[in-house]
Amino acid sequence: MGFAEKFIASLSSRNLRNDAFHHDLDVIAAAALAGDMGALLCRVKYADGTISRLFEGNAGNLAQLLRAWTAAVAKKGQARRWVKATTAWDAQAANTLYRRVAEASLAHWLDSKCKVCHGTGVVSASEAGAPLVCQACHGAGEAAISCSGGFELERIKDMVSELEAIFQSHGARAMRRLGR
């Protein structure tokens, strides 16, 4: 069982005791102690109920994550020289690009499931009755990233992989804290 599965299982625990026999909250404690951005990603994606749920989660965590991620994307964009900002207009365009990339990459990472097949990769055929490969995602179960152009799309894909790397390293640090 991976870190995400253990974290989700800990969230639904009915036993809040923490003694020699009950260890349900250890994963949540390890997640909190393992880091800042990864812990926030974990909280927003799995604990706040913002993904495909009918209730509102903690919008403050999502807003905090969006601010932190936008600042991180701007820093990465400047370091990687995505846009040469020589004039005030260039700086404004660069900031707009950083914000759009941050918002789109975070939205895709938080909920990348195909809306047509709900992430399964197959849809039921009404006439034949047999399942068919989803045409929207071509059976992958992951929705395509929608944006205006190729330049922006490549930056969004790059930042989605950065988010996944942050989350994976956070999970590894948390599992080390658990001693497993």
What are these regions (language model features)?
Residues 142-180:
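Long, charge-rich boundary regions
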Residues 113-116, 133-136:
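The −1 position to Zn-ligating cysteines in a subset of zinc-ribbon hairpins
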Residues 118-121, 138-141:
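Cys/His-coordinated zinc-binding microdomains
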Residues 100-113, 121-129:
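Short, flexible, mixed-charge glycine/proline-rich loop motifs
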Residues 1-100:
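N-terminal alpha-helical interaction blocks
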